[in-house]
Amino acid sequence: MEAQSATETQKNLKTLMELIKTKRPFKSSDFDTLNLDYLSGQSNEELFKLLIDAINGMKENVAKVNEYLTEEGDHSLSGDELLKFVYKELVYDDESEFDKEKLQKLYKTFSEDSNAFATLQSYIQYLQPEENSQRWIQVHEPVKHRRRLNHNPALRVASPNRAVPLSHLKKSSLDPFIGPKSHREARCLNLSVSAKPQGPSIPDESEGKIRI
């Protein structure tokens, strides 16, 4: 997807979500004449959450339409009459500004690539915040720094040529998944333990290692 198309899609999804959430009457002609000024004061995190809500909501609506159209039974309606009935029952009950072509294009966009859309929705559900959960992903502004940042030291694999950072060891008494908890485990991580038992651990900046 081109960058410009992706930007326009994001804007339309967020706006459509707001229209559905606030239950404001809308017409099919509104799909390409949307005013996004009300989103200008939102933070990046708020905009991202709006996008997640919009995708989840649209996924449910598309699933309902598919379920209705594929359920067993004889449908007396077909063609334009069936499209109007589905629009009135599942989208909005005002047909005064019914635009068949725009609705067909909107639905076709999702139905033709439903597998990719379902995959996107399934991944997004893991980003939903849970009550009292520490797994919610916060949205931050990009960090302009040349040094590569490693935000998860627990995933760093110790090698024979690299000592464990001091901050890594400090967490070992609190987190069972980070750092060694005994000298035996420390030796497995190639920590050099000298015969001098005095004093706390001091970082050796010249070698980038830890002296004990």
Curated annotation (Swiss-Prot):
Look up the further comments and give them.
Answer: The sequences of the gene BABR proteins are nearly identical, differing only at their carboxyl ends.
Upper lineage:
Eukaryota, Sar, Alveolata, Apicomplexa, Aconoidasida
Quote the protein name from its UniProt record: Gene BABR protein 3
* Species, as recorded: Babesia bovis
